[in-house]
């Protein structure tokens, strides 16, 4: 195994690129030429993606422990170390982060018209912070990365968003910050008891925390991650954020940021409070079932494409939480697979909506119709992404939902059948969306002048389409990566 600090490279390469853009390009005579900023951003994202692919290739899935571990002293007095590593659960999210960031940066080169330098800087910062969060083995370091993500996403929505972007950005910030306060208080208590933030050390001493304190701790940490997923009733920020965010912002929001909530449950909440997690699991399961049905029904009534996909995300993440809190290998494996699959499918759907918006400058479903006759390639891509979203066998969407339902069936049959109704509702609203946008007669004359996908749009969308199919046909190649890590996680259950 190569002895390079490969995880540090993946984390700091985007940050170094940001510093180069801000300190050198901005101060040079080339500052008025965004092309140089674009070169740096693309090169940085390509190299970061290559570094994460290297980690995946060299990763030993037969070893459930952390690999590529790096540990450096930082602020010992408060227990903060730069302690990073990857296991089977985190490695695929690291790759997903670098992959989606690369796609977003490439797409942004052709669609963002103002403040391109600042826009790309925000995405590079987001990439660095997300990889840092997914690889942190120190709880305080995880918190710092987890919260740092807030700032660039707030700026992306607030500066490059739609008409009501300020409201959406502020709502996003306040909701997430609200959850962060509970998380911070939890960290203070943990350090007062353990005198360490090392996750591997903390999880060995969880029995030393009194039961009542564990219960309070559980709810505090649960709220922090429930806001991020989001679980009802902490969900209302998401539709507004998606509708107002630029296309690439929606891709990162749905593809990566929501996954940090589910990842937080797996990485922090379950190992820290195993007995209390089992005690309160029934409440999470019913909240998840409510989220699946409620979000699906609300999605049916939407007239805005992005808002419909946003509510579908809430429903799909409901399958993630029921899988996690089933405490079964099938359920947890399904939840992880569902997060990865949803990251790909939702990103693809938002990119497709973005291509339509670039042409007609509206996301209102009623303004479309008959688009397939003018954009057959887009129609084919949309069809595959839509079928993946409804969980058709042979697509990635089927595997995650099936395993999550299989896991929860072993512990709660009633919740399983109610959650399964969400699949039916999902098929209804996604087929309805496809029919109204792509099929039928052209009623809007502007659609007559539509041109099919440009090369950069194909480059952005096609890899996601291939992944939807690959994940669906070859799920074992993904499941095997985190199989032993899931077993290791569930030892206390």
From Swiss-Prot:
It holds the Pfam family Proton_antipo_M. Its main location: membrane. One of its GO terms (biological process) is ATP synthesis coupled electron transport. It comes from the Bacteria. InterPro entries: NADH_Q_OxRdtase_chainM/4, NADH_UbQ_OxRdtase, ND/Mrp_TM. It is a multi-pass membrane protein. Disulfide bonds: none annotated. It is an enzyme of class 7 (translocase). It catalyses: a quinone + NADH + 5 H(+)(in) = a quinol + NAD(+) + 4 H(+)(out). The chain crosses the membrane at residues 5-25, 37-57, 89-109, 115-135, 139-159, 172-192, 216-236, 251-271, 280-300, 308-328, 334-354, 375-395, 411-431, 458-478. Belongs to the complex I subunit 4 family. NDH-1 shuttles electrons from NADH, via FMN and iron-sulfur (Fe-S) centers, to quinones in the respiratory chain. Couples the redox reaction to proton translocation (for every two electrons transferred, four hydrogen ions are translocated across the cytoplasmic membrane), and thus conserves the redox energy in a proton gradient. This is NADH-quinone oxidoreductase subunit M.
């Amino acid at each position: 195994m190569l002895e390079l600090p490969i995880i540090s490279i993946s984390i700091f390469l985007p940050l170094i690129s940001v510093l180069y853009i801000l300190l050198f390009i901005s101060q040079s005579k080339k500052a008025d030429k965004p092309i140089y900023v674009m070169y740096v951003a693309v090169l940085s994202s390509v190299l970061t993606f290559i570094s994460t692919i290297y980690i995946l290739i060299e990763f030993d899935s037969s070893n459930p422990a952390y690999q590529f571990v790096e540990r450096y002293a930082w602020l010992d007095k408060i227990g903060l170390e730069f302690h990073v590593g990857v296991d089977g659960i985190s490695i695929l999210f690291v790759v997903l982060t670098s992959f989606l960031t690369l796609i977003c940066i490439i797409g942004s080169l052709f669609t963002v018209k103002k403040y391109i330098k600042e826009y790309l800087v925000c995405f590079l910062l987001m990439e660095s912070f997300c990889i840092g969060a997914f690889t942190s083995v120190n709880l305080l370091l995880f918190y710092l990365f987890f919260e740092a993500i807030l700032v660039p996403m707030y700026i992306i929505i607030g500066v490059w968003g739609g008409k009501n972007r300020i409201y959406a950005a502020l709502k996003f910030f306040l909701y997430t910050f609200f959850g962060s306060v509970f998380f911070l208080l939890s960290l203070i208590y943990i350090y007062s008891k353990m005198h360490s933030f090392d996750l591997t050390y903390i999880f060995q001493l969880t029995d030393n925390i009194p039961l009542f304190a564990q219960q309070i701790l559980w709810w505090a940490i649960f709220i922090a991650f429930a806001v991020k997923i989001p679980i009802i009733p902490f969900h209302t920020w998401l539709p507004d954020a998606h509708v107002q965010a630029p296309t690439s912002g929606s891709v990162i929001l749905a593809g990566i940021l929501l996954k940090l909530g589910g990842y937080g449950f797996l990485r922090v909440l379950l190992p820290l409070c195993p007995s209390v997690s089992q005690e309160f699991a029934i409440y999470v399961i019913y909240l998840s079932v409510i989220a699946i049905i409620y979000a699906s029904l609300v999605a049916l009534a939407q007239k805005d494409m992005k808002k419909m996909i946003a509510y579908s995300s809430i429903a799909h993440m409901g399958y993630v939480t029921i899988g996690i809190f089933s405490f079964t290998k099938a359920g947890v494996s399904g939840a992880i697979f569902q997060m990865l699959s949803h990251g790909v499918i939702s990103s693809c759907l938002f990119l497709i909506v973005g291509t339509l918006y670039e042409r007609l400058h509206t996301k209102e479903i009623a303004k479309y119709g008959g688009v397939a006759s003018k954009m057959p390639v887009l129609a084919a891509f949309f069809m595959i992404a839509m079928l993946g979203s409804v969980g058709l066998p042979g697509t990635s969407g089927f595997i995650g939902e099936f395993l999550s339902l299989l896991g929860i069936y072993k512990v709660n049959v009633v919740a399983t059948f109610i959650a399964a109704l969400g699949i039916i509702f999902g098929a209804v609203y996604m087929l309805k969306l496809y029919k109204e946008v792509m099929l039928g007669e052209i009623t809007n004359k502007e659609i007559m002048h539509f041109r099919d996908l440009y090369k950069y749009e194909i480059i952005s969308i096609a890899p996601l389409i291939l992944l939807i199919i690959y994940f669906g046909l070859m799920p074992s190649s993904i499941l095997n990566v985190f199989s032993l890590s899931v077993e290791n996680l569930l030892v206390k259950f």
